[in-house]
């Protein structure tokens, strides 16, 4: 008799404009409150700027703006989900993030044809654990890494300039 094991993955769960999203926890380094964002001139609209986190300057991407939602002021609930994607550390600004959950593979469905266009490529799957619906993001598609090197170079110059002025 063969026993079938139900494999599950762990996800960081966050909300954005009233919708629940998940990212694979192995891509997340930490979740933190946002104290200060330094704007970077000529950055793409979704790049809020850079933040200093654990001794590093990292780009901060506003997922509301990236997904075409209304930009809202940051508040006490706003979090930054710090990710490591292809060797680059990037902060994702979300409305709220406080939860790690394990989701069985059998409750994650591939996105169907109803989810199409640009937003469709951002969605890796749709999870339905219990009575919840969680959109699982494909971070490689969500974060356009071609924008990030410019931001990293600009932020390094700004940090050097600030240090030289001291």
Predicted regions: what they are:
Residues 1-166:
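An acidic, low-aromatic, low-complexity terminal/linker signal
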